[in-house]
């Protein structure tokens, strides 16, 4: 049995940044930082937040990364811990999720989540 983690997001019509730009931003920041010896998910999140703030200052952003680990090679036994909750206006606020490209090591998959919250009341 194969397990796939897809890129699913809520309706992105109200996103302050188009889906394609979000995907490009995540890929570029990840590409720049993944090869560095001091790579951490906190560094990745910081780079994504910096890019988001350059695109639009009318929103506050929340970025999370979920790393899915295969507990035993060759099995479909995965470990995932990620919780998210929000109270927002569906007309102004939303989220986008994106799976980072898998490397040769298929025992791990990382998911980036970006949340935007309108600063206006």
UniProtKB/Swiss-Prot annotation:
Transmembrane segments: none annotated. One of its GO terms (cellular component) is Aim21-Tda2 complex. It is found in: Cytoplasm; Cell projection. Keywords: Cell projection, Cytoplasm. Belongs to the TDA2 family. The keyword Cytoplasm applies. This is Topoisomerase I damage affected protein 2. It comes from Vanderwaltozyma polyspora (strain ATCC 22028 / DSM 70294 / BCRC 21397 / CBS 2163 / NBRC 10782 / NRRL Y-8283 / UCD 57-17). Pfam families: Tctex-1.
């Amino acid at each position: 049995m194969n397990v796939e983690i897809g890129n699913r997001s809520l309706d992105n019509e109200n996103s302050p940044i188009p889906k394609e730009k979000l995907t490009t931003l995540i890929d570029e920041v990840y590409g720049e930082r993944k090869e560095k010896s001091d790579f951490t998910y906190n560094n990745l999140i910081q780079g994504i937040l910096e890019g988001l703030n350059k695109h639009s200052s009318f929103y506050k952003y929340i970025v999370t990364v979920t790393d899915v680990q295969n507990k035993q090679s060759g099995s479909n036994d995965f470990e995932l811990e990620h919780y998210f909750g929000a109270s927002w206006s569906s007309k102004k606020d939303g989220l986008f999720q994106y799976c980072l490209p898998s490397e040769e090591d298929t025992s791990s998959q990382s998911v980036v989540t970006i949340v935007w919250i309108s600063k206006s009341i």
